[in-house]
């Protein structure tokens, strides 16, 4: 879908790394008409809205949120990669770690997690899974 198109990606993101020289998707990037890097995802969308680029490559939750709030954009079905996210704590701050773990476990146990997963099926794979 993007062959010959102008594409924007945020500087310093995994999207940029994948598309850059030596990245896993370097060959895909070579099919683009041009690849612009922007300092922020908002700048990417500004360039898209202004017609400077034909598409932007951003994380799916960012794209989904932006499209919901701004008419005239759509998300393509292709996914370029998958990432996992975690929560980091200062070394030795076990109390904070335990507090966050307990809060997340609570939403799993009380069914809130299942409701979130049902309401937002596109992001369910990005949510934290815990054992009961």
Please report, for each region that a protein language model flagged, where it lies by residue.
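Hydrophobic residues within well-ordered alpha-helices
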Residues: 2, 47-49, 87, 100
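Conserved functional loop/turn residues at catalytic and ligand-binding sites
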Residues: 6, 52, 111
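Soluble non-cytosolic domains of exported or imported proteins
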Residues: 9-13, 39-42, 57, 90-98, ...
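Periplasmic-binding protein-like
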Residues: 15-18, 60, 64-120, 123-132
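Short, Asp-centered acidic motifs that coordinate Mg2+ and/or phosphate
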Residues: 54-55, 74
């Amino acid at each position: 879908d993007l062959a010959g198109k102008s594409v924007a990606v945020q500087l310093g993101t995994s999207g940029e790394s994948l598309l850059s020289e030596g990245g896993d998707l370097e060959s895909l990037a070579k099919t683009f008409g041009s690849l612009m890097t922007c300092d922020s995802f908002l700048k990417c969308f500004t360039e898209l809205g202004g017609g400077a680029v034909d598409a932007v490559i951003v994380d799916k939750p960012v794209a989904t949120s932006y499209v919901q709030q701004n008419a005239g954009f759509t998300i393509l079905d292709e996914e370029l990669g998958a990432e996992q996210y975690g929560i980091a704590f200062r070394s030795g701050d076990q109390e904070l770690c335990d507090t966050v773990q307990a809060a997340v476990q609570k939403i799993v146990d009380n069914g809130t997690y299942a409701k979130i997963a049902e309401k937002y099926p596109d992001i369910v794979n990005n949510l934290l899974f815990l054992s009961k």
